[in-house]
Amino acid sequence: MRLFPIRSFRRHAAVSGALAAVVIAASCETVPYTGRSQLQIMSSAQESQMGVQAFQQTLAKSQLSGNVAASEMVTRVGSRIAAVTGHPEYQWEYRLIQDDKQANAFALPGGKVAVYTGILPITRDESGLAAVLGHEIGHVVARHGGERVSQQMLVNIGLETAMASLSAGNPATVQAVASLLGAGATVGVLLPWSRAQESEADHLGLILMAKAGYDPHAARDLWVRMAAASQGSGRPPEFLSTHPSEPTRIQQIEVWLPEAMQYYRPR
């Protein structure tokens, strides 16, 4: 049984493909250090504005830590790394959020950086924190936020084309196929790209922390501790995860360490 008219599908696919090709050709940029070509439909200013809004929303529902020494450490380490990014135009901000159950940190477009107190026992010292912030600021340097928005826009074009082609079919069939298309886009396109971005942020993070005067070997040690902390956490398999597994990260870091050490100058 035919689910949708072949001619209609081909027509929509041709239009969608042509539009996507034009967008990609006009919106390619190169990631610093890695040299990877990436799709960037939105401007850096637009991306930064999104980061500012998200940062404000997060802080509005969070409690900042009262630990002055730890907060100063976050600012000190973050500032050293930010100074070597080549982005003085960003309005860099650093916050330590009080949440001992959250072993996490993030950096948003425009230079908005936050660390949760729950990750400090794992980072242990400034070098460990530099490994975390180098990774998070690596996302900012590589403009991964804008890239993910751009990728989602292309995925939406593809899904809309497929749904338009299915519109003449049985409603129940259309709904079932639409669900499969959405799942396929998530597993087959968005998550793999996210894992690639996470790995790239690891790569960039090593270089950034080294340029800031932190020994990049601390990143390997950090992920060994992170692997121990995550055992028994019930995390999803790597195939369905937006982050590479800790063993994969450690192996990749070992490969990148010689390159990062070329940038390392102890302070």
Which functions belong to the PLM regions below?
Residues L3, H12-S16, V23, C28-R267:
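A Zn2+-metalloprotease active-site environment signal
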